[in-house]
């Protein structure tokens, strides 16, 4: 009888103890709301994706027990199911006893990261990186690398066709092929903190706005008499504003429906001529130590090379050097594109007017528009010749 009573004691203890219930779905399938195939020790989805398949303890405990067990559950219950593992948040795992399990537990949530973070585009093209070049006047004022001094020699080759009356000298044969900052996307350009988008008014509104920013009203104008005077500008500000204006005008020429519109081309020619007038005024700059003439619109602080102050003649030559470099890199490619598009637009207007001879009004408007553009071409060529002549005069000294 004693043996029988002793053998019945373990059975009574086993019936009162309930083993924790393992969930039927693994951790990864339940977190993704996907039906688990429930294979043990690892489901098919985790095996295919190379994931660590874990079957956690179910948190549904059912009815609450009246008495709480004073002694903690033995850790040997986990060893009874060697094919299943327990989540780190439900059971603490000793890293000394099971280092492999603790390492995998740290990697459990890596699949929740967005893989697109590892595929972000990385800029490797040096043309997309804004590299500043040394400037005599402002370290951040001019970013174009100037040409050597001997590049002041001007070729007598015509840039445009022979249909125009004026002669437009070619500044540099390599300027049209040199990469310009206007070829980069508008989102990657710098314009002194201002946006380079055209706004809601369209291309013609942008061209007229650039013309208005570059225009200086006459002091005798009664309408502009009460406006604040901004006639005198800094030399580096002229370079920055002209470069930004030429980049915007070049982007307008990339708009297919607007670049062939004669009204837009007229506004573009006006804005380009205003930018060229500021280059001409920058060559007549008066330094702080020089007397300022009444007609001078640009001033420049003294220039230094280290602690050495440049003389008046050296400063004048340096300004001509920088203006010539910016003409080669920004002005000449825009002018070549403008000449090519305006010539194609004029040919298209003539062909469309000859096919519809019944429309007399369209023929007259296209003829008058082409005549206006031709006049603007000649005026722009004459202004460019004056600027080149000033640079040659400064070079000869």
Curated annotation (Swiss-Prot):
Name of the protein in its database record: Cercosporin biosynthesis regulatory protein CTB8
One Pfam family this sequence matches: AflR
Chain's role: Transcription regulator of the gene cluster that mediates the biosynthesis of cercosporin, a light-activated, non-host-selective toxin. The perylenequinone chromophore of cercosporin absorbs light energy to attain an electronically-activated triplet state and produces active oxygen species such as the hydroxyl radical, superoxide, hydrogen peroxide or singlet oxygen upon reaction with oxygen molecules. These reactive oxygen species cause damage to various cellular components including lipids, proteins and nucleic acids.
UniProt xrefs under InterPro entries: AflR, OAF3, Zn2-C6_fun-type_DNA-bd_sf, Zn2Cys6_DnaBD
Gene3D superfamilies, alphabetized: Zn(2)-C6 fungal-type DNA-binding domain (4.10.240.10)
GO MF annotations in UniProt: DNA binding; DNA-binding transcription factor activity, RNA polymerase II-specific; zinc ion binding
Region feature (Disordered): 63-90, 173-198
GO-annotated biological processes: aflatoxin biosynthetic process
Biased composition annotated in UniProt, kind: Polar residues: 74-87
Classification via PROSITE patterns: ZN2_CY6_FUNGAL_1 (PS00463), ZN2_CY6_FUNGAL_2 (PS50048)
SMART domains the UniProt entry points to: GAL4
Keyword line: DNA-binding, Metal-binding, Nucleus, Transcription, Transcription regulation, Zinc
Major subcellular location class: nucleus
Portion annotated as DNA-binding: 26-53
Organism of provenance: Cercospora beticola
Compartments in which it is found: Nucleus
Biased composition (Low complexity): 179-197
Gene Ontology cellular component list: nucleus
């Amino acid at each position: 009888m004693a043996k029988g009573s002793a053998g019945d004691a373990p059975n009574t203890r086993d019936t009162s103890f309930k083993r924790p219930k393992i969930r039927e779905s693994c951790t990864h399938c339940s977190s993704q709301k996907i039906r688990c195939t429930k294979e043990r020790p690892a489901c098919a989805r985790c095996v295919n994706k190379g994931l660590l398949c874990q079957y956690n303890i179910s948190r549904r405990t059912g009815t609450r027990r009246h008495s709480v067990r004073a002694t903690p559950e033995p850790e040997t219950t986990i060893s009874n199911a060697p094919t299943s593992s327990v989540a780190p948040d439900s059971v603490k795992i000793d890293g000394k006893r099971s280092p492999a399990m603790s390492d995998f537990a740290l990697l459990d949530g890596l699949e929740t990261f967005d893989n697109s973070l590892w595929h972000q585009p990385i800029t490797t093209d040096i043309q997309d990186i804004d590299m500043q070049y040394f400037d005599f006047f402002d370290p951040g004022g001019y970013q174009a690398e100037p040409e050597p001094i001997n590049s002041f020699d001007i070729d007598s080759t015509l840039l445009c066709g022979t249909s125009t009356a004026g002669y437009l000298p070619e500044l540099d044969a390599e300027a049209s092929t040199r990469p310009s900052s206007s070829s980069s996307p508008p989102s990657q350009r710098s314009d002194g903190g201002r946006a380079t988008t055209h706004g809601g008014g369209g291309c013609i509104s942008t061209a007229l706005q650039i013309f208005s920013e570059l225009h200086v009203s006459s002091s005798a104008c009664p309408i502009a008499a009460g406006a604040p005077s901004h006639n005198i500008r800094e030399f580096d500000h002229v370079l920055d504003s002209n470069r930004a204006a030429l980049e915007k005008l070049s982007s307008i020429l990339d708009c297919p429906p607007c670049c062939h519109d004669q009204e837009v081309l007229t506004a573009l020619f006006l804005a380009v001529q205003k930018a060229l007038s500021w280059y001409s005024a920058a060559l007549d700059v008066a330094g702080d130590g020089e007397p300022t003439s009444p007609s001078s619109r640009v001033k420049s602080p003294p220039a230094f090379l280290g602690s050495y102050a440049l003389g008046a003649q050296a400063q004048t030559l340096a300004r001509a050097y920088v203006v010539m470099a910016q003409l080669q890199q920004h002005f000449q490619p825009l002018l070549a594109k403008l000449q090519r598009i305006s010539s194609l637009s004029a040919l298209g207007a003539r062909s469309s007017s000859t096919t519809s001879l019944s429309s007399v009004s369209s023929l007259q408007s296209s003829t008058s528009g082409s005549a206006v553009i031709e006049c603007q071409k000649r005026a722009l060529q004459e202004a460019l010749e004056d600027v080149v002549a000033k640079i040659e005069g400064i070079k000869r000294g």
